[in-house]
């Protein structure tokens, strides 16, 4: 097993056989990013679902005034991609950038379609993962509208102290 963090993340949601795991492990694309490297730029079409095997990614947009708006922050063991762009094959509204050296495992369209068709356990996994992503997004939207930036930062550091490492 080359990616124990990835395996554990999958096992957290589904009972994965070694055969099912290896079918995906053999097809992921490994990409290493340095601090401030872009994984995706606004206007590009997302070709991958990225799993953060190690590191930290931030999803943000820049408005017409040049102000930055952070949409999501995710770290080791999470997925962070632009699902809209990936599934619609339309340009992204967001940037995704590494905020420390980061290794991502990329799942492209062909791999996603192959594993969900030939290894049905992944349908369950991605349904659960997408549900959690949706719930997290709703929670973040609520937080953006009900808390100050300082309160959101305090919550983040309290809930994920490893971000300060």
Residue ranges and their predicted role:
Residues 1-29, 85:
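Cyclic nucleotide-binding regulatory module and flanking cytosolic helices
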Residues 12, 37-98:
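Cyclic nucleotide-binding regulatory domains
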Residues 15, 49, 103:
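Localized chelating/binding microdomains
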Residues 19, 29, 33, 57, ...:
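Generic structural signal for secondary-structure transition and capping sites
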Residues 31-33, 74, 107:
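Hydrophobic residues at beta-strand termini and immediately following loops
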Residues 97-165:
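Polybasic "coupling" helices that flank or enter modular domains
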